Curated annotation (Swiss-Prot):
Activity regulation, per record: Allosterically activated by HslU binding.
Pfam families: Proteasome (PF00227)
EC nos: 3.4.25.2
Gene Ontology, cellular component aspect: HslUV protease complex; proteasome core complex
GO terms assigned for molecular function: metal ion binding; threonine-type endopeptidase activity
Swiss-Prot/TrEMBL keywords: Allosteric enzyme, Cytoplasm, Hydrolase, Metal-binding, Protease, Sodium, Threonine protease
Keyword Hydrolase: yes
Residues holding Na(+): 158, 161, 164
Enzyme's top EC category: hydrolase
InterPro entries per UniProt: ATP-dep_Prtase_HsIV_su (IPR022281), Ntn_hydrolases_N (IPR029055), Proteasome_sua/b (IPR001353), Proteasome_suB-type (IPR023333)
Name of the protein in question: ATP-dependent protease subunit HslV
Entry's localization field: Cytoplasm
An annotated GO BP: proteolysis involved in protein catabolic process
Length: 175
């Protein structure tokens, strides 16, 4: 798996992820780019799960963004509907965190769309709970920027989770 974490703080949203691709208990690649910009750089997206499945979902989600003029929630709900009803899509094993300047969402592998708690922190993947815990502690107890919190949370997850490394891709809005 992997770790993807998103933090929204002081008018900035940051999504970061590690670069490890595993096949069973073997590391296949250490520098995969699991966080991307979509919709002309206005939407950040990060994936956890099967790489091929995630790229399929990135492509489908970007189409939904185009269809709905970049409206994040509407695009996510429409993708989730397709995910639940299309036989081929139902077999995809991946989760997405998506964010724009206004909101952040998780799109789950069963076609659910989840909004964050009041703290505006999201995390997915095998190291997601470690990163989520770290980010919450840092938000509550420090004045660090959203980017610094994402970096530190990913580093903590990478130190604990064997399916997460410390080769990060981090994107932020506004940039």
């Amino acid at each position: 798996m992997t770790t993807i974490v998103s933090v929204r703080r002081n008018g900035q949203v940051v999504v970061g992820g590690d670069g490890q691709v595993s096949l069973g208990n073997t590391v296949m690649k250490g520098n995969a780019r699991k966080v991307r910009r979509l919709y002309n750089g206005k939407v950040l997206a990060g994936f956890a799960g099967g790489t091929a499945d995630a790229f399929t979902l990135f492509e489908l989600f970007e189409r939904k963004l185009e269809m709905h003029q970049g409206h994040l929630l509407k695009s996510a709900v429409e993708l989730a509907k397709d995910w639940r009803t299309d036989r081929a899509l139902r077999k995809l094993e991946a989760m997405l965190i998506v964010a724009d300047e206004k909101e952040s969402l998780i799109i789950t592998g069963i076609g659910d769309v989840v909004q964050p708690e009041e703290d505006q922190i999201l995390a997915i993947g095998s190291g997601g709970n470690y990163a989520l815990s770290a980010a919450r502690a840092l938000v509550e107890n420090t004045e660090l920027s959203a980017r610094e919190i994402v970096e530190k949370s990913l580093r903590i997850a990478g130190d604990i989770c064997v399916f997460t490394n410390t080769n990060f891709t981090i994107e932020e809005l506004p940039n």
